[in-house]
């Protein structure tokens, strides 16, 4: 439990962007998870268009070990029909450094990010895309209350998590 208690969330900015680039994700193809550059661009877009949400560089003892973006979703044509009825958040770019996977820290990062966004901006359903071949991520999201849909965008299945 000590490992999890020592994580720190820092808003992603251009000042700490190089930290996000140092996260070891060489074993994860870009078609599975967006790069730090893509997440920085999406973060900038969200800020410029006043979208609510957070993009975090996550640190453990000062070392960047994770990146996550959870923010107001801009509707896409490929969104599942369930999401057309109400505003929702979109989870993007979530990656944990290779050295820190499999110890529960990813779940802690995800849940704390969701709670922070809910606290700061209100509760909404969450949607994410997960590559059809990314079985490890699929199992992770199912364990964390997401439901797989039949809707796809390219090679990504949509997963949804509704508020209680």
Briefly describe each language-model feature range:
Residues 1-4:
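Short, Lys/Arg-enriched N-terminal segments with co-localized hydrophobic residues
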Residues 6-99, 110-112, 116, 120, ...:
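Acetyl-CoA-dependent GNAT
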Residues 65, 103-105, 128:
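Short glycine-rich loop/turn motifs that provide flexible caps or phosphate-binding loops at active sites
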Residues 85-88, 123-138, 142-164:
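C-terminal "cap" of GNAT-fold acetyltransferases
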Residues 93, 97-111, 132-139, 143:
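Conserved glycine-rich acetyl-CoA-binding loop
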Residues 103, 120-124:
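Short coil/turn segments at alpha/beta junctions that flank glycine-rich nucleotide-binding fingerprints
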